[in-house]
């Protein structure tokens, strides 16, 4: 019934299996990939023909994690998987980026790649396996895909590169780098690092590229026995149109690209494009030799040819800069004084307002991942409204691009954050892109670094980012620093590098062509380092390190630790005690399983009141200490005072005042607030308090009362015996 084909190899000490022909046979391509005991199913379906007037390649990649893969039922009311998580979106992009450039130019059939994690062993991360399975399914499908590609993860532990480290090894690694490529070229890199130098990062890329070669061989072997016949697809021959357009418009396009202002340049190019379309489009459709889509495609190709040629020939950029110059930078902090921290970062025509907010444990984000529930204390959100590029558009939930750019900036900042123990706040940074002409994600990195320091977050060092580009024609190439939007779209590489003065914290690279050599990447990294140091120096004009004090509008958090067996006492039955503390003091209180208690409030007095309350529950009263209490009951022989949490003690009638007292209610009544001193414990372990030992107006000890001194001497003699009696009673 099934005609299956299977390839198995040993890869980084674990078996990798690729199988096809048994599952999802109606898809154009389907592969079950297994690594260790993690299993994914990748399918590819591509429409037989493009939609009418389709002017782009509609590729969609959907990566989805099934709860049953780890033996769990989804949470929530519906008990089923719903909208993609942030991680699913990021992995979808991770797969999309290296495969998209490998489709034959001009192919515009609707194509969908769906990858499902159907089993997870909690040891092998499924993202690399999903990338491999997607590539294999595309290679088998017959669509015009010039692959295969493969991916690998690289760690860096104890000075050694590690290929595909287990998930539990990653916390000890100074590097988390994912590389994807073909047999001859690296196509994509995504990484987070602990301030590693450029040579270590480049070595990791090359190590990963070498490590993925056996997987490429396995995919090719599978394709040799299981691939479908290639589809009949011949790219359109538009050479006649290209020649005619070049004669008609080349000089006008060159003139338009001498305009340095982005909006003016775009207006000139759009007007020229409209003029050319009108010239090539006759009045009647029957006489049309070329479609609007074909004309627009060739126009873009001519733009790229002119811009790229100018840069290679003159070493000058669209805006007049040389290859390594960074655009003018202006940094400001505290632009929104009532927020906890804020910054405005402007680099040329790219600008970001970044606002930092400090929160408590209640603000931590709970993330329900396949590996289990965990809490995230650092959030970075990137917003890209349409007005930032002078356009109209929809507003709503963030798209894949916004999520991806935000995560890149998160990776850049994350290694420099203080530990949770030294800075127990939840941190949220929001980047609002207000202008964009290239590298808004790196502007987010710079702005976030400044905003966090403005908020008083003690970053280990400031972080900056820069986007690099590449123009390559044959043996000639030019590496560009701080690229514009046009240089990104018309170039061969988008290479983003973020880090401190000491090293790289995040690196993202997308390459659109083959032939990017190790030497070119080395030049790009060194040039990026120079640019990064320059940007850090410009940022230092606004702020060099974290402010010593938090904003007056920030919450204050104090941390205390109690014994684990005392947690129940602080919480109380059904949460009664902790609710009362919160309601009465106004503080926010978070209790962790290890006995760590975080008390938060903007008011120091509120925090102190909550601390005293908690200490009164978990601590033992100290002999000789003075407490403020409340009279809860009076009797002929004295008054009972609630003085330490729920603990009551007796003030004997002889200890109510220095003078002789004949009636308790002459001195105190129920509900009165009084100061008492803990004198000790009687023979039965009962608390003995004194009011006459304390000045009731100031709460300070009365040192001139002879009877108090005598009482103190007697208590000091009795304390050892009383402690023995209490211990015996407890036993």
UniProtKB/Swiss-Prot annotation:
Predominant cellular place of this UniProt entry's protein: cytoplasm
One term under GO cellular component: cytosol
Coiled coil regions, renumbered to chain: none
Compositionally biased intervals (Basic and acidic residues): 694-722
Swiss-Prot/TrEMBL GO biological process terms: mRNA catabolic process; RNA processing
Residue ranges of domain S1 motif in the record: 624-692
Annotated Mg(2+) binding sites: 488, 494
Domain KH: 555-614
Compartment annotation: Cytoplasm
CDD domains assigned to the protein according to its UniProt record, in alphabetical order: KH-I_PNPase, RNase_PH_PNPase_1, RNase_PH_PNPase_2, S1_PNPase
Reaction it catalyzes: RNA(n+1) + phosphate = RNA(n) + a ribonucleoside 5'-diphosphate
UniProt region (Disordered), positions on chain: 693-731
PROSITE patterns on file: KH_TYPE_1, S1
GO terms for MF: 3'-5'-RNA exonuclease activity; magnesium ion binding; polyribonucleotide nucleotidyltransferase activity; RNA binding
Keywords assigned by UniProt, alphabetized: Cytoplasm, Magnesium, Metal-binding, Nucleotidyltransferase, RNA-binding, Transferase
Cofactor: Mg(2+)
EC number(s) on file: 2.7.7.8
Function as written in the Swiss-Prot or TrEMBL entry: Involved in mRNA degradation. Catalyzes the phosphorolysis of single-stranded polyribonucleotides processively in the 3'- to 5'-direction.
NCBIfam families: polynuc_phos, PRK11824.1
HAMAP family: PNPase
Similarity section: Belongs to the polyribonucleotide nucleotidyltransferase family.
Protein name: Polyribonucleotide nucleotidyltransferase
Organism: Bartonella tribocorum (strain CIP 105476 / IBS 506)
Lineage: Bacteria, Pseudomonadati, Pseudomonadota, Alphaproteobacteria, Hyphomicrobiales
């Amino acid at each position: 019934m099934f005609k299956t084909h299977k390839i198995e190899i040993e890869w980084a000490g674990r078996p990798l299996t690729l199988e096809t022909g048994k599952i999802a046979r109606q898809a154009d391509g389907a592969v079950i990939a297994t690594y260790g005991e993690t299993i994914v199913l990748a399918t590819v379906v591509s429409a037989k023909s493009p939609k009418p007037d389709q002017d782009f390649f509609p590729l969609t990649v959907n990566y989805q994690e099934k709860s049953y893969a780890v033996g769990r039922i989804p949470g929530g009311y519906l008990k089923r998987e719903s909208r993609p998580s942030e991680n699913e979106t990021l992995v979808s992009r991770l797969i999309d980026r290296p495969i998209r450039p490998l489709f034959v130019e001009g192919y515009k059939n609707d194509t969908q790649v769906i990858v499902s994690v159907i089993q997870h062993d909690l040891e092998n991360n499924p993202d690399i396996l999903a990338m491999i399975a997607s590539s294999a399914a595309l290679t088998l499908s017959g669509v015009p895909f010039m692959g295969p590609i493969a991916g690998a993860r690289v760690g860096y532990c104890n000075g050694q590169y590690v290929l595909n480290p287990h998930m539990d090894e990653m916390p000890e690694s100074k590097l988390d780098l994912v590389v994807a490529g073909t047999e001859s070229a690296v196509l994509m890199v995504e990484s987070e690092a602990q301030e590693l130098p450029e040579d270590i990062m480049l070595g990791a890329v090359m190590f990963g590229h070498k490590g993925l070669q056996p997987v490429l061989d396995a995919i090719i072997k599978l394709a040799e026995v299981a691939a479908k016949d290639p589809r009949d697809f011949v790219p359109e021959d538009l050479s006649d149109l290209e020649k005619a357009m070049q004669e008609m418009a080349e000089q006008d396009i060159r003139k338009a690209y001498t305009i340095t202002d982005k909006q003016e340049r775009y207006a000139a190019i759009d007007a020229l494009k409209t003029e050319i379309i009108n010239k090539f489009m006759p009045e009647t459709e029957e006489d049309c030799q070329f479609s609007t889509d074909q004309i627009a495609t060739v126009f873009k190709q001519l733009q790229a040819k002119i811009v790229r040629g100018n840069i290679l020939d003159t070493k000058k950029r669209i805006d007049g800069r040389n290859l390594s110059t960074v655009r003018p930078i202006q940094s400001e902090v505290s632009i929104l004084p009532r927020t906890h921290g804020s910054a405005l970062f402007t680099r040329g025509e790219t600008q970001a307002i970044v606002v930092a907010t400090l929160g408590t444990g209640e603000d931590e984000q709970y993330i329900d991942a396949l590996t289990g529930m965990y809490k995230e204390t650092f959030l970075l959100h990137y917003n890209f409204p349409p007005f930032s590029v002078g356009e109209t558009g929809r507003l709503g939930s963030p798209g894949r691009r916004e999520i991806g750019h935000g995560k890149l900036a998160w990776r850049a900042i994350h290694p420099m954050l203080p530990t949770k123990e030294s800075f127990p706040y939840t941190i949220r940074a929001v980047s609002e892109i207000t202008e964009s002409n290239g590298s808004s994600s790196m502007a987010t990195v710079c702005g976030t670094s400044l905003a966090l320091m403005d908020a008083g977050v003690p970053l280990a060092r400031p972080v900056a980012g820069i986007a690099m580009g590449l123009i390559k024609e044959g043996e000639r190439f030019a590496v560009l620093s701080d690229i514009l939007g046009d240089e990104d779209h018309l170039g061969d590489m988008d290479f983003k590098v973020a880090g401190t003065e000491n090293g790289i914290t995040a690196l993202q690279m997308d390459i659109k062509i083959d032939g990017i050599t190790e030497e070119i990447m080395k030049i790009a990294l060194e040039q990026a380092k120079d640019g990064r140091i320059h940007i850090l120096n410009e940022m230092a004009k606004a702020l060099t390190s974290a402010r010593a004090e938090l904003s007056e509008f920030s919450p204050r958090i104090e941390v205390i630790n109690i014994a684990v067996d005392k947690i129940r006492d602080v919480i109380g039955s059904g949460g009664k005690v902790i609710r009362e503390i919160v309601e009465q003091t106004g503080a926010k209180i978070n209790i962790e399983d290890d006995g760590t208690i975080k008390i938060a409030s903007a008011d120091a007095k509120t925090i102190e009141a909550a601390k005293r309350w908690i200490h009164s529950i978990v601590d033992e009263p100290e002999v000789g200490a003075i407490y403020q209490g409340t009279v809860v009951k009076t009797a002929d022989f004295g008054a009972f005072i609630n003085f330490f949490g729920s603990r009551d003690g007796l003030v004997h009638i002889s200890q109510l005042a220095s003078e002789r007292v004949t009636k308790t209610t002459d001195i105190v009544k129920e509900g009165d607030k009084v100061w008492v001193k803990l004198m000790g414990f009687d023979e039965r372990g009962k608390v003995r308090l004194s009011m006459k030992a304390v000045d009731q107006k100031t709460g300070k000890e009365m040192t001139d009362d002879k009877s108090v001194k005598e009482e103190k001497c007697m208590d000091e003699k009795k304390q050892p015996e009383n402690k023995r009696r209490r211990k015996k009673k407890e036993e």
